[in-house]
Amino acid sequence: MSRIGKKPVPVPAGVTASVEGQTVKAKGAKGELSFVVHDEVLVKMEDGAVRVDPRDQSREARSKWGMSRTMISNIFVGVKDGFEKKLEISGVGYRAAMQGKNLQLSLGFSHEVVYDVPAGITVAVPKPTEIVVTGIDKQQVGQVAAEIREYRGPEPYKGKGVKYAGEKIVRKEGKKK
């Protein structure tokens, strides 16, 4: 029994939600999102909340149950408040800058890395060593942040590279003479 799936998802103030078949749509101050729930899961509106139940007690239905509830919850939070992911750059000469709609990264390569920011995502560079990725879709914000981090992930000896804000890098000891 999914402890997460059992709880109904309350529709926050300022968000209008509708359920049409297996599609949940939400509209809020930040924008509009929809999520198609898996066929193994039943979804319905009850008393200003969205309720998610498994169609039967099969393993697949139970495995999709909690995930579907969380995805619907993320849609509501996204259209109301949005999501944000911060990245930090550390290393000599490593920096970031916005160039129009593209993010330009100097990460120690012989060339500049230019990242084309997808639609629906906003990237800001408050400092040359800090990147802030924001948007209404939690999955897309996380994916963009992961793609930026992938260009030069933090290395374990000096900690140089792109890392998430607050991420702890497990450091290794260098060679001994």
From Swiss-Prot:
InterPro entries: Ribosomal_uL6-like (IPR000702), Ribosomal_uL6-like_a/b-dom_sf (IPR036789), Ribosomal_uL6_a/b-dom (IPR020040), Ribosomal_uL6_bac-type (IPR019906), Ribosomal_uL6_CS (IPR002358). SUPFAM superfamilies: Ribosomal protein L6 (SSF56053). Keywords: Ribonucleoprotein, Ribosomal protein, RNA-binding, rRNA-binding. GO terms for cellular component: cytosolic large ribosomal subunit. GO terms for biological process: cytoplasmic translation. Pfam families: Ribosomal_L6. It comes from the Bacteria. GO terms for molecular function: rRNA binding; structural constituent of ribosome. Part of the 50S ribosomal subunit. NCBIfam families: L6_bact. This protein binds to the 23S rRNA, and is important in its secondary structure. It is located near the subunit interface in the base of the L7/L12 stalk, and near the tRNA binding site of the peptidyltransferase center. Belongs to the universal ribosomal protein uL6 family. This is Large ribosomal subunit protein uL6. It comes from Brucella melitensis biotype 1 (strain ATCC 23456 / CCUG 17765 / NCTC 10094 / 16M). The gene is rplF.
